[in-house]
Amino acid sequence: MGIRKYKPTTPGRRGSSVADFTEITRSTPEKSLVRPLPKKGGRNNTGKITTRHKGGGHKRQYRLIDFRRHDKDGVDARVAEIEYDPNRTARIALLHYVDGTKRYIIAPNKLSQGDFVEAGANADIKPGNNLPLRNIPVGTVIHAVELRPGGGAKMGRSAGASIQLVAKEGRFAQLRLPSGEIRNVDVRCRATVGEVGNAEQSNINWGKAGRMRWKGVRPTVRGVAMNPVDHPHGGGEGKTSGGRHPVNPNGKREGRTRRPNKESDKLIVRRRRTGKNKR
């Protein structure tokens, strides 16, 4: 993937850039692997806003991604297409299995149209192959890692993400995550070899607010800039600091909200790098 920069023909174009999509081989998705994706606008079933700054955006179809692949152990698949997916930053690869099945997977770096991939304990260590952690050599870069055996890939799914297998001790494998955290994961959990492609995604300059609106992202307005009816931090004469600890529009305290007693925290060997308002 490369990035194409625009000339400053308008204020919105100045400094903006876009992916060149050179790796994309097909512009329309496989019809059997898409589902409708109704807009929710960040609201739940009662109409209450549960996620702010969401709404609008271009119409999308959801691509069904195979995050497990355990039911295709030992079945070879050919990479038929590399496609764009509007629902994630990574590209997706359309696999044609020799038994006639078609599936989408996250497209790792260096996976090209026409390559062959497989899943299973005896698969080779090459990009796109899916194996249990116990069968992957220490030091290998992986992505799409399960947290629980058979639970489907949960970690390392976004563009450019890579996880390194740093050690194996007993029934656990130690993984170094992109955040710097080192975590124990059951060796029966599966992962895909290689790093996720489209790593240049993070270098794209969106250029104008309108491009974010196309993605369904609405403006983020500070509470202190609102009226008292709209936010607990609103109002006051002149500019104010809010006068209280940071809260959300409902009055619930915000900031450092990570649970210190989450059940899975006992599997963390070394916590992620910390900074202001992080744990």
Curated annotation (Swiss-Prot):
Residues 1-59, 224-279 are annotated as: Disordered. Belongs to the universal ribosomal protein uL2 family. It comes from the Bacteria. GO terms for molecular function: rRNA binding; structural constituent of ribosome; transferase activity. Residues 50-59, 269-279 have a biased composition (Basic residues). HAMAP family: Ribosomal_uL2_B (MF_01320_B). Keywords: Ribonucleoprotein, Ribosomal protein, RNA-binding, rRNA-binding. Part of the 50S ribosomal subunit. Forms a bridge to the 30S subunit in the 70S ribosome. GO terms for biological process: cytoplasmic translation. This is Large ribosomal subunit protein uL2. PANTHER family: LARGE RIBOSOMAL SUBUNIT PROTEIN UL2M (PTHR13691:SF5), RIBOSOMAL PROTEIN L2 (PTHR13691). Pfam families: Ribosomal_L2, Ribosomal_L2_C. GO terms for cellular component: large ribosomal subunit.
